[in-house]
């Protein structure tokens, strides 16, 4: 029963004027059937995916961040302290042949709070009452029906935000025949009073919305029935609500001006929104780490265009960044910072860790001026940021352990400890992909573990496929307990690092 073939998505539209399939006990409201589709997933799968869709409205709308559940009759969990309860009670409906099982009120949180306001919405779950279904030849009820109701807390279509359909209510109905193991899913709309025959109702748009809602159920229902297992877990280190609220705040404050003033040749939107997301994550991470104590400062190694450093400093976090090459953007992002070697927040430096044995450069290798070098030693406690730092990525947990500094590493391109491009061994977990990126992430995590770090992994909510964040904020070993030279040898050694660093002086900056 779990291996039924998924049918192609070919919904059937109900013709205009079709009789309602849902009837309220009050007998007044007229629910309009919009479309339906055959399904091979049973009631328990429908109930499971509908609860997930209620808790995660972003699966249905790109305009939404999330939903905060502010009322749940079946839950004894307290409402989060930062969620304000409205005086509106749940807006439920009673349907003929159904018993209400659960009632929730969720607050829809939009991505753009400057354009759209949050909206409270009642969500209710129903099951058909015993004896209310069709009977088989033996006189037994053979049809199971499950219904989910959505009622926005708005008195008219004009008071609904952009991201919500201009309807008074939405119902999604699942019907399952236990004998034939065949079912249907359908979508139904309730229009606002006086608008049933009004010209202002955009039937074409409502049809598209119903199609999309049905398609989402079809996709997730068959995935659940087939035993789909989610591979990626977000919001492990920082709660989703806090990250999204901070990201929305930063985006509203800085995004427009940063995009308009972009000096690089790379795509401004990608870099601006990506770094705003990383900044939001770091700010909320630091909120937990440094509650009640002074922030120790940060250093962004391989800082690139310097935008992340700039955003964090605008938000009041002291720190600096360095890179092998100066960027155009530094002219507008650079500021004074007494904690850096030059007194500037952005500066050109080559990383030559003090732990690396001194090499005698050959005739073809450019001699590096000592004033252009940083030895990778930082004040104890400084938070190290390594965002797509490429050659510096595997060095991040090593430098962090030597200086006893917490860190975040967001890997991108694969380099070994000498700075050469290479492909790391496949991940230890055989269930993970064997791609070059997955291999790099696991390899860097292994280095971190050997340096004593308790590594936390966060899949960052940023517009990048390279969004894995490795966080080290707790080290189980003292620096004196770690044989760093043995660690370097275990992971390939460092012979040739000096000449590879010297080459960076001649190369063109990368655009990621």
Swiss-Prot record:
InterPro entries: tRNA_uracil_MeTrfase. Its main location: cytoplasm. Keywords: Cytoplasm, Methyltransferase, S-adenosyl-L-methionine, Transferase, tRNA processing. GO terms for biological process: tRNA methylation. Its EC number is 2.1.1.211. It is found in: Cytoplasm. GO terms for molecular function: tRNA(Ser) (uridine(44)-2'-O-)-methyltransferase activity. The keyword Transferase applies. One of its GO terms (cellular component) is cytoplasm. The keyword tRNA processing applies. It catalyses: uridine(44) in tRNA(Ser) + S-adenosyl-L-methionine = 2'-O-methyluridine(44) in tRNA(Ser) + S-adenosyl-L-homocysteine + H(+). It holds the Pfam family AdoMet_MTase. Belongs to the TRM44 family. Probable adenosyl-L-methionine (AdoMet)-dependent tRNA (uracil-O(2)-)-methyltransferase. This is tRNA (uracil-O(2)-)-methyltransferase. It comes from Gibberella zeae (strain ATCC MYA-4620 / CBS 123657 / FGSC 9075 / NRRL 31084 / PH-1) (Wheat head blight fungus).
């Amino acid at each position: 029963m779990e291996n039924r073939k998924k049918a192609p998505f070919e919904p059937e539209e109900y013709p205009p004027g079709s009789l309602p399939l849902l009837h309220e006990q009050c007998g007044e409201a007229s629910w309009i059937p919009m479309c339906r589709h055959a399904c091979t997933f049973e009631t328990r799968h429908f109930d499971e995916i509908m609860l997930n869709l209620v808790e995660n409205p972003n699966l249905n709308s790109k305009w939404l961040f999330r939903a905060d559940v502010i009322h749940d009759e079946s839950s004894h969990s307290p409402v989060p302290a930062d969620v304000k309860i409205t005086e509106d009670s749940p807006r439920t409906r009673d349907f003929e042949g159904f018993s209400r099982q659960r009632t929730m009120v969720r607050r829809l949180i939009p991505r753009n709070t400057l354009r759209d306001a949050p909206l409270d919405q009642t969500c209710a779950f129903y099951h058909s009452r015993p004896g209310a279904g069709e009977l088989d030849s033996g006189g037994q009820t053979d049809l199971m029906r499950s219904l989910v109701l959505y009622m926005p807390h708005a008195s008219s279509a004009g008071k609904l935000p952009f991201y919500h359909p201009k309807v008074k209510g939405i119902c999604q109905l699942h019907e399952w025949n236990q004998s034939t193991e065949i079912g249907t899913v359908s979508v139904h709309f309730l229009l606002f009073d006086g608008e049933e025959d009004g010209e202002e109702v955009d039937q074409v748009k409502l049809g598209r919305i119903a199609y999309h809602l049905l398609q989402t159920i079809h996709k997730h229902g068959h995935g659940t029935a087939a035993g789909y297992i989610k591979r990626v877990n977000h919001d492990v280190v920082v709660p989703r609500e806090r990250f999204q609220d901070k990201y929305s705040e930063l985006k509203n404050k800085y995004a427009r001006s940063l995009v308009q003033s972009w000096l690089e040749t790379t795509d401004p939107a990608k870099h601006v929104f990506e770094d705003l997301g990383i900044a939001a994550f770091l700010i909320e991470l630091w909120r937990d780490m440094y509650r009640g104590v002074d922030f120790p400062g940060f250093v962004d190694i391989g800082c690139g265009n310097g935008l992340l450093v700039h955003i964090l400093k605008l938000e009041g976090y002291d720190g600096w960044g360095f890179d092998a090459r100066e960027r155009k953007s530094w002219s507008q992002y650079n500021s004074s910072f007494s904690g850096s070697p030059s007194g500037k927040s952005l500066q050109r430096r080559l990383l030559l860790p003090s732990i690396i044995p001194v090499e005698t450069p050959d005739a073809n290798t450019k001699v590096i001026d000592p004033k252009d070098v940083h030895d990778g030693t930082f004040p104890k406690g400084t938070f190290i940021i390594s965002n797509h730092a490429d050659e510096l990525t595997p060095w991040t947990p090593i430098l962090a352990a030597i200086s006893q500094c917490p860190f975040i590493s967001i890997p991108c391109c694969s380099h070994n400890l000498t700075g050469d491009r290479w492909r790391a061994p496949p991940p230890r977990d055989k269930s993970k992909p064997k791609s070059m990126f997955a291999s790099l992430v696991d390899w860097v995590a292994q280095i971190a573990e050997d340096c004593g770090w308790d590594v936390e992994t966060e899949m960052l909510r940023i517009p990048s496929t390279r969004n894995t964040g490795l966080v080290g904020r707790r080290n189980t070993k003292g620096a004196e307990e770690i044989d760093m030279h043995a660690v370097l040898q275990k992971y390939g050694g460092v012979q040739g690092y000096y000449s590879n660093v010297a080459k960076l002086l001649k190369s063109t900056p990368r655009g990621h």
